[in-house]
Amino acid sequence: MNSLSTSAFSLGLLLVMATAFPTPGPLAGDSKDDATSISLPLTSANKVEELIKYILGKISALRKEMCDKFNKCEDSKEALAENNLHLPILEGKDGCFQSGFNQETCLTRITTGLMEFQLHLNILQNNYEGDKENAQSVHMSTKILVQMLKSKVKNQDEVTTPDPTTDATLQAILQSQNEWLKHTTIHLILRSLEDFLQFSLRAVRIM
């Protein structure tokens, strides 16, 4: 019963985030009645910030679980060499750092990067052997975050959609790995998404 309550609360929070901010997809049509029991900041920037912090909290819980259950606490050079994941990162040219900050360029890059991460989060959700509820929450809430950020990008054409065949390629890579490497791959995805979101959070705070 407690897990059901937690799940309902988490979903309610995500729906509140989505309905309280203009989104380009179906989420914009969700009922706002779910928002009545939860008080959230009123500005759009704060809503993005709160959602990023929510996702980071879920990632932290998953990483702790991987460390405790699967002994995946640190990266190894062997694992990095064998995982050709090309995970998104933020660089100086992306305009997200205080030096050379450019809001439009930064928003576009964060949105595109998170869309790329969605493919890796499919792997996480389908293959994670621990708390699947938290894994699903990371996947769902990242989708909502993409919609929230994309709605703020002025030139929508600059947001590039990942190649759909990449998902099948990533799944094939994972299936070819032994259990140790599978756990390492999931650990790397979580760690990289955490880093990406932490930099994104800093950028959102100066927008």
UniProtKB/Swiss-Prot annotation:
Pfam families: IL6 (PF00489). GO terms for molecular function: cytokine activity; growth factor activity; identical protein binding; interleukin-6 receptor binding. GO terms for cellular component: extracellular space; interleukin-6 receptor complex. Disulfide bonds join C67-C73, C96-C106. SUPFAM superfamilies: 4-helical cytokines. PROSITE patterns: INTERLEUKIN_6. Keywords: Acute phase, Cytokine, Disulfide bond, Growth factor, Phosphoprotein, Secreted, Signal. Residues 1-20 form the signal peptide. It is found in: Secreted. The modification Phosphoserine is found at S76. Its main location: secreted. Cytokine with a wide variety of biological functions in immunity, tissue regeneration, and metabolism. Binds to IL6R, then the complex associates to the signaling subunit IL6ST/gp130 to trigger the intracellular IL6-signaling pathway. The interaction with the membrane-bound IL6R and IL6ST stimulates 'classic signaling', whereas the binding of IL6 and soluble IL6R to IL6ST stimulates 'trans-signaling'. Alternatively, 'cluster signaling' occurs when membrane-bound IL6:IL6R complexes on transmitter cells activate IL6ST receptors on neighboring receiver cells. This is Interleukin-6. It comes from Vulpes vulpes. The lineage of its organism: Eukaryota, Metazoa, Chordata, Craniata, Vertebrata.
